[in-house]
């Protein structure tokens, strides 16, 4: 069984250079206390979380991975407002490919009525339960 997790908005555990010196993103699962704030190992400038902030474009490679992942058996939409495209269109794309769709979100979204199952709860509650049943 293949699993694919696409982080359209990045990851807090990945850092990148604030100035974009060309250093590739690096992963750091610990909070570096020295120096604080963390620095780019290539140029010494400030590092920033490897996430997409408001007004920034989603990484095209991740968008392409997400669209390709819609050709699946099970599609989980977790913690999204389903308001902003291209992410808002992924549930419909997965359904087009015949996927069973599940939304996990405390609040109803525009996708709620379209998914096969809507679980109205926080991801940090639902995902461990799903994991324990699959594990």
List PLM regions with ranges:
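Conserved catalytic alpha/beta core of Sir2/sirtuin-type deacylases, generalized to analogous enzyme cores
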Residues: 1-135
């Amino acid at each position: 069984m293949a699993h694919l997790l696409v982080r359209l908005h990045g990851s807090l555990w990945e850092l990148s250079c604030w100035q974009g010196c060309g250093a590739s993103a690096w992963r750091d699962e610990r909070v570096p206390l020295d120096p604080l704030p963390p620095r780019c190992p290539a140029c010494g400038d400030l590092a920033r979380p490897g996430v997409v902030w408001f007004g920034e474009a989603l990484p095209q490679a991740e968008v392409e991975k997400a669209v390709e992942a819609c050709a699946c058996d099970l599609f989980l939409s977790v913690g999204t407002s389903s308001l902003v495209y291209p992410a808002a269109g992924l549930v419909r794309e997965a359904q087009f490919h015949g996927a069973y769709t599940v939304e996990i979100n405390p609040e109803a979204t525009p996708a709620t009525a379209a998914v096969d199952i809507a679980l109205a709860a926080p991801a940090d509650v639902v995902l461990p339960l799903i994991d324990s049943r699959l594990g």
